[in-house]
Structure formats: structure tokens, C-alpha cells
Amino acid sequence: MACEAFYTLTMDYQRLLDKIRLRSTELGFTGIGVAEAELQADQAHLQDWLDQGQHGQMDYMARHGDMRSRPDLLQAGTLSVISVRMDYGADDLQAWQTLNSPASAYVARYALGRDYHKLMRQRLKRLAEFIEHEIGAFNYRVLVDSAPSLERALARNAGLGWIGKHTCLIDKDSGSWFFLGEIYTDLPLPRSNEKPQGHCGTCTRCIDVCPTQAIVAPNRLDARRCISYLTIEHRGSIPEELRAPIGNRIFGCDDCQLVCPWNKFAKIHAEPDFAARNNLDQASLLDLMAWTEEEFLSRTEGSAIRRTGYINWLRNLAVAIGNAEPSAAHLAALNEKTAHPDPVVREHAEWGLRRLESKLRA
């Protein structure tokens, strides 16, 4: 114990942090900073959001009390949080082309490749092991959206960007197309000195473009109206008034990021695991609707898409096909699903069928 105390007192933590930064770059992280383990002001903002019921069915957001804003409650002894960024930017032109092609399926960019949770967790674990190699055993916990944590607030405090009006983190040199992850540590690492100020100014492009008006105020997202929530987290029937605005977005939505002026500086990712799988960046609605449950499970293995489940996958596709142009193939696909054993699938297939038929009569 005495040796450990002496080692701690004589540790050059700035030199250690410099080494951590270098190793993080080698592991594919595109930004890194250190935040203090205190987020009480952000906890108040979260609680107000919860009190308004704007988290929808995401009951897990209301659990754990102050644990999100008190990292030391989640990982005992936490003194500082290493926050990292990994870019997943791609060509915006293809995204717009898909959105403007009603018969095509739009899958949010982050979900086209391998599940980022698994990839980043592995890389963060390797970063923690590097630290252990440098200084010996220390207490830490790796997080990638896997425990109660205010990751955007931590990243902001670590100097990685500011929280934009669409509630995503923005870096003035890299935009907002990136994932976040953390290592909670008991090391007194030097804190990031620069806390980026907001640079959204009077811009409201993200608010204006939202198909369902889910951004109800700057920095305020009503998840109950958000297409990402509706197509991924929400279980059961999608409110009927929100189905048409969903368009052909079958898993998530990127509109608020696609229009953000800061994303002209976004970096195109160089991570092979983020490349689109199973042709998901140019698949037709009909092709995906034809997947059996076995095909869905097989083709979404290792993908974030599996989170939504097969029933909600069919539900989302039924809505999207209903929003497409009427064709014999679209009508036939929906008609087949009106006999599906699940009532949610039947309901949305029937809605889509009525919508296509109304377009034919118009």
C-alpha cells in the first residue's frame, strides 16, 4: 500500500495522458478528453425532460436516480472520465438520394454496419489495458451507451464539442457524425481546459427539417415524436398522425444531422466495420419486407438493427410501403401482411394498404 501511495504521488499524469491520447489515435478514436465526474446541472435538465414524459416508453431513462450525473455512484472511486469519439461520417449525397426515393429503405447511417457498441467497447477495453500496462492495476469501467451515463454532457465537459439544438454533440472541425464512449477511472488525470461554446447561433435548420417536429425547442427533443424513437425504441402501434411523416425511414432518422451546416466538416470514416452490410444502404422496401424472421435474425447478427425486433421491423416497413407510390408489388406485399398473426403488423399493413388505395383514387 505504501508503495502504491508513493507511486501515485510521483506519477506524471500529464505525461500519462499524452500517452493515452497517442494510443487512442492508434485504436481509431478521433477525439479524446477528460471530464470531471460532476454533472448536477445536466441532471436537472434530464429530470425536467422526464417530468414532461418526453422519454416515451424509455422507462430505463427514469431509473437509477442521480447515478447518471454522479459517475462515482456508478463506479465507486471515480475521479475522472476519459471521453472518446469515433467518427462514422459518410457521403451525404447517397443518403439524400435514398430519402428522395420512396421505394427505397432508409436506415440511419449509424446502423448500416457493425454494431458500434461492440466495436467501441473492445477498443476502449484495449485502451484501458494499455493504461494498466503503463501504471499497473487501476479501477475503471468501460461504457458505450451501456449504463446510466450522461455521455454527451461528459463529452462536452471533456472538450469534445457542444450540444447542438438537435441534442447531438457538435465539434466545429468534425461536425456531429461520431459515436461516444467513456472510461470511468479512479485516476486524477488532468481535465480538459477548453469547454467549447455553442456555435449554432440563430440557425434552426435541424428544428425546421424534422419531419415530425420532434425538436420542440432548442436542445429539447420530445422522443415521443422522434422517428428514431418510433422506429427503434417504441413498441406497439405508431400514432397514426406520425406515420405519413416517417416516409421511407425504417430504422432511425438522420435528417437533423444531414442539414447541419457544421457537418460540411465531418470526416469520412475509415473503419471497415462501419461499412454498410447486406446492401442496407441501397435496399428496396420490398426486398426487406420479404425477409423471413430467420433471415432477419441472420442478416442483422452483430448489427444495431436487431434491437428493434422482427415484428417492429415489419411494422416499420408496412408504414414505409404505405408512404411509397402505389404499385401492384407494394399493394401485394401489404395485402399479404394483413393476414400476419401479429396484430401490430396487421394494423400497420392495413393502414398502408388504405393509404396506397387512397392515392390510386386521388
Predicted regions and their residues:
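C-terminal amphipathic alpha-helical segment
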Residues: 239-273, 298, 302, 306, ...
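Iron-sulfur cluster-binding cysteine motifs and their immediate structural context
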Residues: 29, 205-229, 249-273, 333
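Conserved hydrophobic register position within alpha-solenoid helical repeats
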Residues: 317-318, 349-350
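Short coil turns that connect the paired helices of HEAT/ARM alpha-solenoid repeats
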Residues: 306-308, 336-344
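Auxiliary alpha/beta "docking" domains used to position bulky ligands
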Residues: 10-199
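Positions within the helices of HEAT/ARM-like alpha-solenoid repeats
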Residues: 313, 344-346
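Amphipathic alpha-helical scaffolding segments comprising HEAT/armadillo-like alpha-solenoid repeats
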Residues: 296-299, 326-338, 359-362
